[in-house]
């Protein structure tokens, strides 16, 4: 098709609206204990349509025109709740961190298409036979929930011990295997601190 035909007969429209936001709050219960909460969201919607005029050079099925509409929705929501305790007893320092998090992703999509209209250039899904129409829709949901913790201890900044662990549950895995745990243990010795005493 020549450029003038495309400009006047073939129309495409596309629109996207997006919203993102974050919220966080922290409370100091004491000088050694605090709690925090964070939430974030990312959401957008995309809608587009496409018209092809009758009599163009497109395939035979579209000689009487084609019209399509597509809509896509996306939403991602995350939350994080944490608490931290930091205390010292004599030469020993202790730190305990516990938390939980969620990640929730959802999508929706709808698609409608009609072609070879009964009345050329009248763009309506009702203007095509069932054989010349196609409607489809889909939806998906994914959720990840986790709990985690870390314990740290040291003696005179010389001996250090760290124990941590996290367990996640994923909705995309088979029911019997949705939970998975990964622990970690580490330690260290800074012998040079002994010479500072």
Predicted regions and their residues:
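Surface-exposed loop/turn segments flanking beta-strands in extracellular/periplasmic regions
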Residues: 1-5, 50-66, 108-135
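Outer-membrane beta-barrel transmembrane strands
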Residues: 3-50, 68-88, 95, 105-109, ...
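Conserved short loop/turn motifs at secondary-structure junctions
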Residues: 100, 166-171
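Short glycine-rich beta-strand segments
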Residues: 101-105, 190
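Feature captures outer-membrane beta-barrel proteins of Gram-negative bacteria and organelles
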Residues: 118, 181-189
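Outer-membrane beta-barrel domain signature, especially the mid-to-C-terminal portions
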Residues: 126, 176, 182-184
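Solvent-exposed loop/turn segments connecting transmembrane beta-strands
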Residues: 171-177
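Outer-membrane beta-barrel translocator/channel fold
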Residues: 194-197
